Regions:
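A Rossmann-like FAD-binding core segment of flavoenzymes
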Residues: 182, 186-214, 219-222, 282-380, ...
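Structural micro-motif
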Residues: 60, 66-75
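Non-catalytic, surface beta->alpha helical segment in thiol-disulfide oxidoreductase systems
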Residues: 76-108
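Short active-site neighborhood of thiol/selenol oxidoreductases, capturing the structured segment around
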Residues: 14-26
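Glycine-rich dinucleotide-binding loop and its adjacent helix/turn
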Residues: 109-118, 122, 231-284, 377-379
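FAD-site-proximal beta/loop scaffold in flavoenzymes
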Residues: 237, 242-259, 353-405, 409-412, ...
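Thiol-based oxidoreductase modules, predominantly thioredoxin-like and allied folds used
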Residues: 3-4, 23, 35-42, 46-61
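Beta1-alpha1 glycine-rich phosphate/pyrophosphate-binding loop at the start
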Residues: 120-192, 275-301, 308, 316, ...
């Protein structure tokens, strides 16, 4: 694998052969999560396909020329021609493999797959998810001498790692960068001795057998499972959103705001995330138009007051997006006034969406008792409806979802499990 610059693009990528190019950024958790997958697959496919990386921030002109609008972005080339699908954002290992396989003959793909040998490992407790709840559970279990493995499709930290600042975590007088707070949580749990398997694809989850398969070949078994899978951003489901996701529409200000210096953006939403991230984006963008469906923000008072004082931010209350489209290098957002029913087109360089979250339960939706919103029901010890399975953090049914409440959930589950196992 090789790091290149735009001056080497022609000789390293376009000169011939099969190449996969990773555009990455700093302070980008999805980039950090895809890096070990990229490196691991380079060892597996490296004899047939060249793996190269390019730092997007220092090669902006080429990135824009190639249509790269989000980090990370993987592009695939065959004899100088871009082929396969472009991958962006939270990229799965299986998605990369699918595109790599499309570049090679079927027989060669079979030979490569034959090199992968299945493995099995066993633990006392398996934690699914490395956000604050999962990390806290891992720390308490480790300190109780319980053999624990922590699994996550991304790197540790959860949403905290992409939060610009955390101002209400006890013990810190000044606001803390989210990435630093999550890093410290992760390091504390790791140094205690908890085993980490992160930035992996979770291929299969069997709650009855207490068994999880990662990256299609590694089976991990445990006596107890803690579900700490958290939540994911809601999509609006309007025309053009899916097509422009990662190509002008972003759900991560920490990852992409830096690329909108002196540019105009649209921010969708009105809760804490939307208001706080809009303020962060204004450090880079020259103008922000916020679109919110209600007549007032639902964010906390301090965040609202700070936003209203920001001269870069214009607000459209009681409006909703109806479609997104690309016109040249611009994104056109059509919004509808919910009172007058008139529609307006907003032309910008990019769009950021923060309209709430949904629980990550797809792989065990039918196995556990859920509330009407799809969140997992638990008892006071964080036990779910299935014996031996616990749940903590934002994925569970509760009134408030904060870093501190996730930490409390993880603490309770870990103590309950440690007592039961011992």
């Amino acid at each position: 694998m090789k790091e290149i610059t735009s001056s080497e693009f022609e000789t390293e990528v376009l000169a011939g052969g099969k190449v996969v190019l990773d555009f990455y950024s700093t302070e980008c958790p999805p980039c950090e999560a895809v890096a070990p997958k990229f490196e691991g697959l380079a060892k597996l496919y490296g004899k047939d396909i060249k793996f190269v990386k390019m730092f997007r921030q220092q090669n902006k002109e080429l990135a824009e020329k190639l249509g790269v609008k989000s980090s990370p972005t993987l592009l695939f080339f065959d004899n100088g021609v871009q082929v396969a699908h472009t991958l962006t954002g939270g990229i799965k290992r299986s998605d990369i493999i699918h595109e790599l396989d499309s570049l090679l003959p079927t027989e060669r793909v079979k030979e490569i797959k034959a090199l992968i040998k299945p493995t099995v490992s066993e633990f006392d407790v398996l934690i699914l998810g490395a956000g604050p709840g999962g990390l806290t559970a891992g720390l308490y279990l480790c300190q109780s001498k319980v053999n624990t493995v922590l699994i996550d499709i991304a790197l540790p930290g959860g949403h905290v790692s992409t939060t610009h600042e955390v101002s209400n975590y006890p013990g810190f007088i000044d606001p803390q960068p989210g990435y630093l707070l999550s890093h410290n949580m992760s390091e504390q749990t790791k140094l205690c001795g908890t085993i980490y398997k992160v930035a992996v694809d979770v291929t299969k989850i069997d709650l009855e057998k207490k068994e999880v398969v990662v990256d299609e070949f590694e089976t991990i078994r445990a006596k107890k499972i803690i579900i700490a899978t958290g939540t994911s951003p809601n999509l609006m489901g309007v025309p053009g959103e899916k097509e422009l996701k990662g190509k002008g529409i972003s759900y991560c200000a920490t990852c992409d705001a830096k690329y909108y210096g002196d540019k105009e953006v649209v921010v969708i939403g009105g809760g804490n995330s939307a208001v706080e991230e809009a303020d962060f984006i204004s450090r880079f963008a020259s103008k922000i138009t916020m679109v919110h469906q209600f007549d007032a923000f639902t964010a906390n008072k301090q965040a609202r007051e700070k936003l209203f004082e920001n001269p870069k931010i214009n607000i459209l209350f009681e409006n909703e997006p109806r479609s997104f489209a690309r016109e040249g290098d611009k994104i056109v957002t059509e919004v509808e006034d919910l009172k007058t029913k008139t529609k307006t087109k907003l032309t910008s360089d990019g769009v950021f969406v923060f309209i709430g979250m949904k629980p990550n339960i797809a792989m065990f939706r039918d196995k556990l008792e859920l509330d009407s919103w799809g969140y997992i029901k638990t008892d006071e010890d964080m036990r779910t409806s299935m014996p031996g399975v616990y749940a903590v953090g934002d994925v569970i049914s509760k009134k408030y979802r904060q870093i501190t409440t996730a930490v409390a959930d993880g603490t309770i589950a870990a103590i309950a499990i440690a007592k039961e196992l011992n």
